[in-house]
Amino acid sequence: MTLVISNTVAAILEKSSNPLIISEIDLPSDLSNGQVLVEVITSGLCGAQINEIEAVKGPDKFLPHLLGHEGFANVLQIGPGVTNVAPGDQVVMHWRPGIGIQSLPPVYKYKGVPLNAGWVTTFNNHAIVSENRITKISSANHDKNIIPLLGCALTTALGVLKNDAQIIPSDSLLIFGIGGVGLLLIKIAKILGIKSITVVDIYKEKLDKAIELGASKTILFTDKNQTNHSLLEYFGTKFPTVVIDTTGNTLAIEICYEISAPNARVILVGVPKHGKKVSIYTLPLHFGKVLKGSEGGHSKPEKDIPYLLKLIETNTLYLNDYPTQSFSINKINDAIAQLKSGVVGRMIIDFTKSS
C-alpha cells in the first residue's frame, strides 16, 4: 500500500552523548505486512532514552537511529494483515510486545542513507510501527500528556509491583529514585493497598512531591553511609519487604539489597552504566531473598492498558497532580536537559506545538 506521506520531521541520534538532530526524514514508499502508519500526537521522554543517548549499555552499533517508546497517536494507514486497528483509531504506542503481527522494522532514510529504527519509535511526527507495538483505545477526550505514559511509565510501574514483586497489602515498600516511574510506583502502590511507602532521592523537590502523592517517609540521599544510617534508624529491625531501584546507581542498588528484609523482593528497574559493577553478599539469596531485573514489569499491553485507562477514567488512579511539562519537537533537547537536571515529573514531546 502506497503511503499517503513521503517525509516527516524527527529527532535523530547521530552521535552518542550529543544533542539530537531535528530534521526531515524520508519514509519508505509503502507498508509491508503487519506495519501501521501513525501520526504521533505526544510522546513521553523516558530515562531509557537518556541511557540510549549516553550509550549507558555500551557502544551504540545502530547510529544514526530514531528514539522513543511511549506515545499517543492516530492511525493513518494499515498494511497487509493488520486486523487490530483501523485508520482513524487512537492508539497507545508501547515497546513491550502486545497482540498482532510483529512486522519487519521500517527503513527510513536520512540524508539519503538508511536510518535505523525499531518496531516502535515516537520522537518522529509520523512513524511506521509494528501492529503488536500499538494498542487501540477509545476516542474519548483524553489528556494528551497522560496517555503516552500508558506505553511505558504506567504499565512498567504496575507490572513491577504486581508481576515482578508480587506485592500484597501487608508488604512495606522502599523506592529509590522518584522520577517519572518512581512517582507512579507510589500512586499504584496506594491503589494496591500498600500503607508503608518510603522513598529515597537526591532531589528535595522530588521528595516533597512524593509526600504529596502519598509516600509515608522520605530520605535525602547524600552518600551511601549517610543513607544507610538514615534507613537503619527509620526501619529499626523491620526492613522493607519490597525494594525497587529505578536509578541504576550502583551504590543505591547495594543499599537496596542490604537494607531489605530476609525474604524481600529487590527489583531493579534502572540499569547501571556499562562496566559498573555491584558488590553484594549472596548468602541471603539462598534463604529467600530475591534480586532480579525488571523488563518493563513484564507488562501485557493488551491487558494492562485498558485496566489502567479505566482506573484513570474513574479517578481511582488520580493523575491531575502528576507533574508533566510539554515541549515541541524542536525543543526536545531542552526537555532532555530538564530531565537530566532532576526536574520533577515527566517531560512530554507534543507534536501539536509549533514552538
What are these regions (language model features)?
Residues 224-237:
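Short amphipathic alpha-helix with an adjacent loop that forms part of the alpha/beta core around
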Residues 28-43, 56-100, 138-140:
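Glycine-rich beta-strand-centered segment in the early N-terminal region that forms part
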Residues 194, 250-316, 351-355:
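Glycine-rich phosphate-binding loop and adjacent beta-alpha segment
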Residues 139-223:
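Mid-domain Rossmann-like dinucleotide-binding core that forms the NAD(H)/NADP(H) cofactor-binding site
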Residues 46, 94-133, 144:
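Cysteine-cluster motifs in flexible loop/terminal segments that predominantly coordinate metals
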Residues 1-6, 254-258, 302-355:
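C-terminal hydrophobic helical "lid"/dimerization subdomain
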